[in-house]
Amino acid sequence: MGLWALVAFCLLSLILVGSAEQCGGQAGGRVCPGGACCSKFGWCGNTADYCGSGCQSQCSSTGDIGQLITRSMFNDMLKHRNEGSCPGKGFYTYDAFIAAAKAFPGFGTTGDTTTRKREIAAFLAQTSHETTGGWASAPDGPYAWGYCYLREQGSPGAYCVPSAQWPCAAGRKYYGRGPIQISYNYNYGQAGKAIGVDLVNNPDLVATDAVISFKTAFWFWMTPQSPKPSCHNVITGGWTPSGADRSAGRLPGFGVITNIINGGVECGKGVVPQVQDRIGFYKRYCDILRVSYGNNLDCNNQRPFGSGLLLDTI
């Protein structure tokens, strides 16, 4: 080993000793936030040093999910999103979806091909339910009408709650917008901070800029908010249920993601139409991607998660 290499190694060793590792075996199996790679040394990042040889989790082999979901697949999944009757006509494009996904490099790139395809299917299924324009006898069935809506329908309120960190801007409303129908000032604030956009003062960017709109949905998907894990960690196997989770019936699978998103309304109540609708989208998209569904698709017998920042607000 050369002199400078030895010096660099010693300095790195001192740094590592003087600070706590962030992820992997060095941190009790913790995964990195935002889908970042966990290096063999237990640090989070998105470069080859973190995602390459020895990477412990969320190891992105490529940031381009277009290899798994082509434009034609995307258009087939969201077949009727551009119907004249859909308020979101022309907004939700494949290019915006791919561009936004690249800002979250762990999405659709974590795990084996089956896991990666399931994550894409699960994300599009859950967001399709939130934006669906379908009905039971709709052309091509109810699960071909995802991404029809852009803004919350009816006469939504301001969705403003007192917040020292994310105070509401005068005249702004924080009702549901975009793929995940993000709501409330504090969620707009957190999402905006994560993607580098002031959404507290400019919430309608979620309904006028398609890339920003998709990014808010990916932010929600990739971000754990205690006591809830992230949707990403659940679908990719990065979440291990605690004893309390198991007692509550919360086992890894698509059903827990529904619990994360709207468990207080939909879960633990037996068979409810909303849960079945989400599953219907998921199965159709898995079929298009030619991947199996996995286990535990519903949350019929799951108790909802406890209080969290995103609980039942989206």
Curated annotation (Swiss-Prot):
SMART domains named among the record's database cross-references: ChtBD1
Enzymatic class: hydrolase
Active site: 130 (proton donor)
Bridged cysteine pairs (disulfide): 23-38, 32-44, 37-51, 55-59, 86-148, 160-168, 267-299
Highest rank taxon of the organism: Eukaryota
InterPro entries, per the entry: Chitin-bd_1, Chitin-binding_1_CS, Endochitinase-like_sf, Glyco_hydro_19, Glyco_hydro_19_cat, Lysozyme-like_dom_sf
GO molecular function: chitin binding; endochitinase activity
Coiled-coil positions: none
CDD domains for this protein: chitinase_GH19, ChtBD1_GH19_hevein
Signal peptide: 1-20
GO biological process: cell wall macromolecule catabolic process; chitin catabolic process; defense response to fungus; polysaccharide catabolic process
Family the entry assigns: Belongs to the glycosyl hydrolase 19 family. Chitinase class I subfamily.
Protein name per its UniProtKB record: Basic endochitinase
Organism: Vitis vinifera
